[in-house]
Amino acid sequence: MFRTSDAFSSFAVPDIEAARRFYGDTLGLDVRDSDESGLLEIHLGPGAPVLVYPKPDHQPAVFTILNLPVDDIEAAVTDLNDKGVEMERYDVGGSTADDRGIHRGNGGPAIAWFTDPAGNIISVLQDTGG
């Protein structure tokens, strides 16, 4: 019924150029113009890219829109902080964040959340090799 190999996700931002700078320059991701319609593609590896589309009346997502596994969460948070990105703190099933904003325990990998310029929630999480 569905061809999952062609499945993709997308999210909205009010300012496509701010998104291009944040995802490309700040996060160092492979960001490309999708076509002449003003969409961006974030290429994260094999498979379909994540589409980013402009929406003037954008409302930030209240959930994590993108999870980025990293080999060293401490280094990733340091790098983000050095680039002016601040970690968010959430109540996650009783776990609390350390002074750097990294949540540990609660049965999952170490994780830290931050927002893009549009207020969408993103995470970096310790890659557990799974």
Give the residues covered by each predicted segment:
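Vicinal oxygen chelate
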Residues: M1-F2, L68, V77-G130
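Core segments of cupin and vicinal oxygen chelate
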Residues: T4, S10-P49, P56, A75, ...
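Conserved short beta-strand elements that form part of the metal-binding/catalytic scaffold
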Residues: D30-D71, E88-R89, G107, I121-Q126
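Intrinsically disordered, low-complexity N-terminal regions enriched in serine/proline/glycine
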Residues: R21-F22, V52, R89, I102
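N-terminal beta-strand motif that seeds the catalytic metal site of vicinal oxygen chelate
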Residues: M1-A18, F63-L66, L125-G130
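Acidic active-site catalytic centers that drive phospho-/nucleotidyl reactions
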Residues: D15, D72, D116
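Generic N-terminal initiation segments characterized by hydrophobic and/or small/turn-forming residues
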Residues: S5, G24, A48, P60-F63, ...
